[in-house]
Each structure stands twice: as structure tokens, then as C-alpha cells.
């Protein structure tokens, strides 16, 4: 299960790096692949959502990208396997196994079993991901932001002990509580000791363009930036860094970006998110910022362009990518 991605031929196009989360990031990558089938595309994927459940290592964003690009995703839900069954979940419930709020599908379970077996055998997550992708042939290189533990936890008022605060895993905050609990902040556990996965920094530094997918700016892109060295590489790369807004008309395209932004005191607008990322000419990471045609934004030091941002299908998404690369000055 080792070796190079068989589906990635020697690149003849530009070298593109994309920072991505789960559903939105995966759909954006479909557009990148649609537009640039011969390019060297490397996706640096959020691992802040990763969690141990029932003795297995779950990597939601890596799996969503892998299944989406490999044709195995449940397109109606946007996550998990198509044709999924839930017998293992039912059996765990019969045993009163905890936690009972996080379901693992039968098909999905196989991925987690293989991943956990390889991790326990000593393989780093990046090598495990490469091995899993040999089956799915995603057409882009999927790389975890780090091989180390770097999990997003959420500081909340303890629902069971009012008046007391405690930190819970992001999955519990979102899946169990649906963010409907008094929330005080986010913490990235392990970030102080984490290192970028192999080649991540080199890929950013040698890229022709770096794109920030329209993923959650706090717990997806933000969690990637929490890995020491990645933000610095974005600030010094020779490539232009172009972000794509995941907020349209004051609402996230999907997911809970509004809930997360509220916690850190950022408005749910394209302008506010662009300012949150900031300009590379100051202390931020952006050179350019794509917003939807119905939005307006002024981000000091950042070139803002209004284009249609609804990712209805890969060809439509490819046009978003085209605009991002044009803003980056990349020709192919």
C-alpha cells in the first residue's frame, strides 16, 4: 500500500497548492482538477477535526477530500460513503458503547481500520494517506497539514456543571451539541509541538500559486495555519496567495463558519473574513480575495475581485479557480 500516486503523471502545468477543509474544500479541488488536469496540485488538508473514536483514528477532512475526488462520496450529505450502511453503529448502540453521538458507517469503517493499523505500525499520517489514496486515485496529492496531533478543541461552559468551563473536542461541540452551548474560544491541542508534514513548506515555497479554498476560516484554514511554519511560509512564498470567500450574502456556503466566526468576534461577511486573513503587505497572508458578485469588500492591501462563487458542479467551480489563478498572475 505504499508508493507514489499512480494517477498523478509528471506535471506539465503550474504548481498549485490549495489549503482545504472538508466538504467545501473537496468541491473546490474538483474544480482545480477540472481546470488543470495536468498541473501539479497539492492539497494541504486540515487535521484539526481528527479524533479517536472506538479505538480508531478518524480524519474527516482527509476522508471527505479522498472520497469526493475518488467518486465514493455521498453527494447528498456531502460526507461519508455513498451506499453506506450502519450495522456496526447499531451493534455499538446495543452494547451501550460511548460515545453514542458519533456514527461510523460500515464502509467508512474499513478506511479507519486500515489507517489505524498503519499508524500503530509506525507509519506517519502522510504516508498512510498516500497509501489510502492509491485505491481512490484522487488526481491531486492529498497531504495532511501535519503528521502530529494538532486537534481543535473548544472551551465551553460545561453543560453538566453550569458555571464551570471545560474543553471538549471540536467533534463533540459540533456533532453532539451542534454548537448550541455557551462557547468561549478555540484551542489547538498539540500545535506547540507539531511540525508541518514532509514537503508541505517546500511545496508552498515553490508553488506558482497558493489558494485558500472556501473552507471554514476558523476551524479549517485556521487550524492549518496553527501548525508552526505554515503561516510563515505563506508570508514568504514567491507565489501569490489568493483566498476564496466561503461566505456569501452574510451566510456560509455550508457548515458552521458563522458559529465559529462569532466565537472569535468576526462578522460573517466576506469583507470581515478577508480582513481576518489580512494582507501579506501587512501581517496577514493574502494577496488577493475572491468574493461573490452580490458582496462588496474592502480589504486593505488585498486585491478584491467579485466573481460568481457558487460551486454547483466541477465545470462551474473550475471558473472560480480560473479567476483565482488569473488574480495570482498564473498562465498555463
Swiss-Prot record:
<protein>
    <recommendedName>
        <fullName>Phosphoenolpyruvate transferase</fullName>
        <ecNumber>2.7.8.28</ecNumber>
    </recommendedName>
</protein>
<comment type="function">
    <text>Catalyzes the transfer of the phosphoenolpyruvate moiety from enoylpyruvoyl-2-diphospho-5'-guanosine (EPPG) to 7,8-didemethyl-8-hydroxy-5-deazariboflavin (FO) with the formation of dehydro coenzyme F420-0 and GMP.</text>
</comment>
<comment type="pathway">
    <text>Cofactor biosynthesis; coenzyme F420 biosynthesis.</text>
</comment>
<dbReference type="GO" id="GO:0052645">
    <property type="term" value="P:F420-0 metabolic process"/>
</dbReference>
<dbReference type="InterPro" id="IPR002882">
    <property type="entry name" value="CofD"/>
</dbReference>
<dbReference type="GO" id="GO:0000287">
    <property type="term" value="F:magnesium ion binding"/>
</dbReference>
<dbReference type="GO" id="GO:0043743">
    <property type="term" value="F:LPPG:FO 2-phospho-L-lactate transferase activity"/>
</dbReference>
<comment type="similarity">
    <text>Belongs to the CofD family.</text>
</comment>
<dbReference type="InterPro" id="IPR038136">
    <property type="entry name" value="CofD-like_dom_sf"/>
</dbReference>
<comment type="subunit">
    <text>Homodimer.</text>
</comment>
<keyword id="KW-0460">Magnesium</keyword>
<keyword id="KW-0808">Transferase</keyword>
<dbReference type="Pfam" id="PF01933">
    <property type="entry name" value="CofD"/>
</dbReference>
<feature type="binding site">
    <location>
        <position position="63"/>
    </location>
    <ligand>
        <name>7,8-didemethyl-8-hydroxy-5-deazariboflavin</name>
    </ligand>
</feature>
<dbReference type="InterPro" id="IPR010115">
    <property type="entry name" value="FbiA/CofD"/>
</dbReference>
